[in-house]
Structure formats: C-alpha cells, structure tokens
Amino acid sequence: DFEYFVHQYPVELAYCLALIHARSRYSITPRWVLKNYPVVENIMHMLRGNPCLAGCSYCRHSLDIHGALKRYFNFDSYRKYAEEALQENAVKAAVTNKSILAIFPTGGGKSLTFQVPALMAGENMKALTIVISPLQSLMKDQVDNLEKSGITDAVTINGLLDPIERAKSIERVENGSACVLYIAPESLRSKTIERLLLGRKIARFVIDEAHCFSVWGQDFRPDYMYIADFIKLIQREKQLDDPIPISCFTATAKQKVIGDIKTYFKDRLSVELELFAANTSRTNLHYEVYNNGNDEEKYNVLRNLIESKDCPVIVYTSSTHRAAMLAEQLREDGFDARAYHGKMDVKQKKENQDAFMAGKVRIIVATSAFGMGVDKKDVGMVIHYEISDSLENYVQEAGRAGRDENITADCYVLFNEQDLDKHFTLLNQTRLNQK
C-alpha cells in the first residue's frame, strides 16, 4: 500500500507525513485539502490508524489500548463482566476499525468503551468521533464528566446551549481542539452540522442508546432511522473507499431489538456489527415495592424513604405536572428538591441538572427525560413514585442508582392500582385511529 501511494499520490503522502510531524496536537487537515485531495484521509488512516507489523514502536505506544486507558483515565485495567474481558475486547475491536454492537449493563462502563478509541483517534489521526445521543442531559453529563477527568477534547451541540456556547463548540470542532462531538439524531438534518463534519476526518460514528432504532423498543426514535442516510451522504461527499466504522451501545436489548439494529446497518450501509454482550446483573441494587392505598399514604412513604438515608435521590414520575408539583411539595416540607422535565425552561432545566450532578441539590424529581445515560456515581436511591411504562424503561431508570460498585443502593416502586389506569389512558392518547 505504501509503495502504491508513493507512486500514485505523492503530494497527498507528503502532506500526511508533514502533518504527522506537526508539533501541535491540534493541527488538522483544512477542509479545502479534504475536498480537493480526498485520498489524504485514506493515507492518514493507513499510516496512523492501522496496526502494522509486530515490533513497531509507534503501534506499541500509540495504538496500545492499555496505555491509553492509563493515560486518559488513570485506570490500570478494563472492567470484566462475569470474568469476561468484554470491555477490553470491544475497545480493541474499535481500535482495529471494526464496527460493533455492545450491550453492557447500566453503570457498566460503556462510555469509556467508546471514549478511549475516540481520544486515541483524535491524538493519532487528528480525527473526530461523532457520538449520537437521544438526550441533551446525557450529552452535557458526558462532556462534564470528561472535563472532571482533565479531558477537554469533547464538546456538544444541542438545544441547551446559548448562541455563544454553540458558536464556541462549532469553533472547537473546526479548529481541531475537539475530537469528540456529541449531537442529537435530529441535528443530522442540519446543514451546519453537515458542513462541520465534511471539514474533519471522521474516525467513527458512535450511536448511544441504540435500542432507539427498534420499533420493538419502548424508546423508538424515528430520527434514528435517518442516521444511515446521513453517514452515506458523508461517505459520498468525502469520496471514501471504505465505510466509516460504527459503534452501537445499549444497556438493555431484547433479541428482536438486537436483530433490528444489526439488520438496519447491514441493509442500509452493508456494515456487519460484531456483538459484545455482557451477561451480568447489578448485585449492589436492592429492590422493593410498596403498595399504597391513596396519594397521601404514598407521599408519606416517599418522605420516610428519603429521610431514611442520607444520599442523592432520584424520584421518577410519569408526568411533567406531577414532577413540578412533587418537587414543590418536598421543598415546602424542608427537603432540598428540584424538578426536571421536558416542558421546563431550558435554562432552568440546565441549572437544576447541574445543581444535582454537582451535589448542591440532594433530590431531583423527574420524568423519564432525566433517564438514559445520567452518570452520577453516588446516587443511593431511585424511587418510582409511579410505575414506569415498560420493564425496559424501569431497568434503565433504576440503573441510575449505585453506579459506584462500592455502595449499596435502593430502588423503590410506590405502587398504586390507579397508576396502571394512567398509563392505559396515555397509551390510548398516542394511538392513531382511522375514521
């Protein structure tokens, strides 16, 4: 391959060699070079992103996934699931440019599994990894957690940002100081995002909460179905010879959902996803159900549970109205509580999330909008004031507790027969009828 590029693309090869020896870590290939010399991406990938012969000093250091884990996150080893090295194997597969589907339990380290290869690609190839996530709270949480670890290479572009913050994120992607970009699937229809990604070498597309692909999943998101079309557009515009690798992650997936995800990428992009599935349970979670007769009794149980343990608490409700009302009632009774739901003012929602994540507020009363991917290690209690609308959603939401394996966390459901009627009514309201 090297001899071929020497003879056929000497200018592109010379450029890549010069870029490799640039002193600045954030030196990237300008957009006009990518557009006029598309082979540059292939050469850069061959030189810096492909493991080569045994004994190569570059590969031994820069493509060493254990060294990267220690360098970026100061961990000595990858997490095992029932003595299986699934996390390590998934990272290794990504670094060797395979497309994967990883099913890890909540709190099982799935974020680190795609962050290590993304940071390595940014450092080695000046490349950008795009992480597609369904929730704004998840994106912000991930970026904040990386910054706490001293990693400032990630940015997000979403509706929670004001115009100045959005402009700064775009600038950082353009100038190469960001190598990880978190966006929502809806953003893929934006011409700004399209232009932004065409101006960078793309290392990989990561799809978080991949169960949103499947009509069999409770969180089906139609915008996820556009992802393959967008990737195909980027590949065509960049004139790429090889498909951009893809990583899909989810914590809960039925066999039908797994089949849907794999079939989607096989049919749309001719990409085979290698499966990494963990068969393990969360042994540090304690589950209990309280059967309550009326609202007053239920609220008293809620108060008693919160008072019984001094720890961060998430209280889930099924409606925005209930979340706001319950948070206010708890505050009136002397508890440090705030609400979080989809109908809140964007600024207020961001402030409430920040306060809870930083430990300034002990209790967050939320709808499922405060769900997937929220990563606060010390949550010691999750209380469902009303039952979830599916078992899958319950596993996701209860899994917010006890993400630190060294603590024991409690998951309570305050059950009332009337809750089932509420969910049945909501389901009927969303049904399409032909008249």
Where are the language model's segments positioned?
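Conserved SAM-binding loop and adjacent beta-strand
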Residues: Y81-E83
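Helicase motor core with emphasis on the C-terminal RecA-like subdomain
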Residues: H45-N74, A85-N89, V95-L101, P105-S111, ...
